[in-house]
Amino acid sequence: MRIAFLGTPAFAVAALDALDWAGHALVTVVAQPDRPAGRGQALREPATKAWARARGVPVLQPEKVRDGTLAAALRALAPDALVVAAYGRILGKDLLTLAPHGAINVHGSLLPRWRGAAPIQWAVAEGERETGVTIMQMDEGLDTGDVLLQRALEIREDDTSETLAPRLAALGGEALVEALRLLEAGAIVPVRQDAAQATLARILEKEDGRIAWTSPARRVSDRLRGFTPWPGAFTTLEGRTLKVLEARPGADAEAPAGEPGEAEVVPGRGLAVACGGGTALLVTRVQLEGRPAQSALDLANGLRRKRFRLGT
């Protein structure tokens, strides 16, 4: 097929690799514009743009996608299908319908669960043990189109959204190639989503990372894993931000007496922090505002205390 590809971050590169390997003709890669990044705020090109430039594939980076300009440019390339993977923009009907096979999306969840911008993060943060990828025929709704193909994937006990994303991306590439093959052969029957089963994976905000010590330790741990690397998990210690970098649910017997947020040194292991329901979170690595990352035990040694309160 002649494919016009729309995608921006590293997650989308696996789909490009799969399309290239399968012999599809990439007529263009459409990515978001270069954005300032890092401490120096230098312009950084999207991962998909770098992939395309290295292979001589034309790149488009429109500031606007709903004024008809992009649709006209793509129509002139006569693609058989648009493939969309984490592009980051809402597409209008003019784009969704310009190719014979329409627009095909690679989505990082088992739709209708986790429709929206952050499906990988929310699946982990909500403690789910399975997720997957959906190849979907796009419509004008938010991830509401008919399902063409799905593949499931286990969420491991120690997965973060950062470790899970590459595995989902690779699975998405494989599923995409299979779906396109079946689509060309007329062997796919689109399945309508059950809207009653839908959940929303809304855009993450910085405040989502603030730890609620009144939650059970398992929920705090799941949120830490889901929100790694951003927004991370953080609390306060005597008015200073304390990032919790590594932690896991501890034995309930380790929970310090007192209110949620009470922290106590567990010799040789870390800090046991009291959480909701009498549970304990064993914190092993942290970063206090203005300091480098360190073990939780080193933090306690520096404070010269074996017990203190977090969230203050």
UniProtKB/Swiss-Prot annotation:
InterPro entries attached to this UniProt entry: Fmt (IPR005794), Formyl_trans_C (IPR005793), Formyl_trans_C_sf (IPR037022), Formyl_transf_N (IPR002376), Formyl_transf_N_sf (IPR036477), Formyl_transferase-like_C_sf (IPR011034), GART_AS (IPR001555), Met-tRNA-FMT_C (IPR044135)
Source superkingdom: Bacteria
Protein biosynthesis keyword on record: yes
Binding site for (6S)-5,6,7,8-tetrahydrofolate: S109, L110, L111, P112
PANTHER family, A to Z: METHIONYL-TRNA FORMYLTRANSFERASE, METHIONYL-TRNA FORMYLTRANSFERASE, MITOCHONDRIAL
Family from the record: Belongs to the Fmt family.
Protein name: Methionyl-tRNA formyltransferase
Organism of origin: Anaeromyxobacter sp. (strain K)
Gene coding for it: fmt
